[in-house]
Amino acid sequence: MVNSKRQQRSKKVASSSKVPPTKGRTFTGCWACRFKKRRCDENRPICSLCAKHGDNCSYDIRLMWLEENIYKVRKHSLISSLQARKSKSKPLCQKISKSRFKQMTHFRQLSPPTSDCEDSVHEASKETTLPNDNTFTISVRRLKIYNNAVASVFGSMTNRDYTQKRIDKKLDELLNMVENDISVVNLNCSKHGPYSVFRANPAAVTSALTDQLPSPGHSMSSAEETTTAALSSPPEDSTSLIDIIQGKIFGILWFNCYGNMILNRQEYTTWFINKMRNSLTTEFIRFLGKIIDDPDINMASCLFKECIARWSCVDWQSIAITMLVIIHGYTCPNLTKLLRVWFLQQKLLRFSMYPLVNFIINNTQDLDVLYHCNGLLGNADLFEDPYQDELTSELHVLVTERLVNSWKDTILQQLCSCQDTTLSCSQLRYWQLQLKCNQQFYKDVYAMQD
């Protein structure tokens, strides 16, 4: 009996000395507690910590791409001086003041006010802090995307709703509209996708944002701005020309440039866009739009033949064939045969053919085509653009490397078939020497400049 009582006492002491288990970290508190990294008891409508510290308690849903952190606050003089120096070469329309940003976005705080009194307090505090030296900038393109998205998801300023149910329903509707919009075939419409569904907010359109903005992209942005400025006043018979260039051709190049080292270069892209703007006619631009609108692989060879028959200019043919190859690749045997015949007929390498040459080198194993490509690069006239000589040297290295690999494969096949490899080994040594010379030339002339 005594031992049993002692055991019960020891169990009670041990249980009382145990530390109560701590709760794990939660991710469902109000926004004020999340920002201050404190534990929220999630009381509604105001948690105890927000009530104690006088913070604005909000459980509203926020989309990450609508946050106010898309602008940069310049708090230090060093950052301000650097930004001021960089801004001298940029147009003034690319910057807006803090007060102007607030007026254009109708955005006062991260979450809606819980009462009219709270809204007036925030307005007064904003007005008192505006004249300080800390300013921030935002690009015009981001401002437009932000301004459009707020109205399309959360509703207008008077009927704005941040609740989870409203946002889930609205996003489902918009995404369904995007899917339906892509599936609809409308010959009169040149653009599909989210930008035709997430409509602009007409109340926020001002004279400062009336300039046409370039499509988002990689290194093509500066060239697109040049083209947009030059085409801002088009003739009446070429109204659809700008839509085709901006809505179709630029989009195709942007999504497919990463597999082509020529289209991925800003210098070549600038030249390419200027070439289209200055030399291509409205009829030919519409033909390019027809190539993009008709992705049927069976029509690729027909469009190829139509281009060769209608236009004799090698530059125009190169641009059209490049668009066909970008869209269809080497999945169409008839298109590949036509491309081979057309390329072998070329006696002079034009600068407009460079993206096509890059596609051919990366996708063909035909030695005749590679030899012809190497010969064209060796005899190219480097007068169309100052950057042409460097790209020519890079393509020369690429094609000789491709020839070296082709002869290595040939020798391996001959060894497996117990055939004589004397001639193949001679060819391999020759192209290895050519590759070494081309690489050394590029390294000495261009790599040292970088």
Swiss-Prot record:
Q: Where is this region: Disordered?
A: 1-23, 210-234
Biological process terms in GO annotation: positive regulation of thiamine biosynthetic process; positive regulation of transcription by RNA polymerase II; thiamine biosynthetic process
A GO cellular component term found in this entry reads:
nucleus
Q: Which residues lie in Low complexity bias regions?
A: 13-23
Looking up SUPFAM superfamilies in the UniProt record yields:
Zn2/Cys6 DNA-binding domain
UniProt DNA-binding residue ranges: 30-57
Gene Ontology molecular function, alphabetical: DNA-binding transcription factor activity, RNA polymerase II-specific; RNA polymerase II cis-regulatory region sequence-specific DNA binding; zinc ion binding
In terms of InterPro entries, this protein maps to: OAF3, Zn2-C6_fun-type_DNA-bd_sf, Zn2Cys6_DnaBD
According to its UniProt entry, the function of this protein is described as:
Positive regulator of thiamine biosynthesis.
Which protein are we looking at?
Answer: Thiamine biosynthesis regulatory protein
Q: Which organism is it from?
A: Saccharomyces cerevisiae (strain ATCC 204508 / S288c)
Primary gene name: THI2
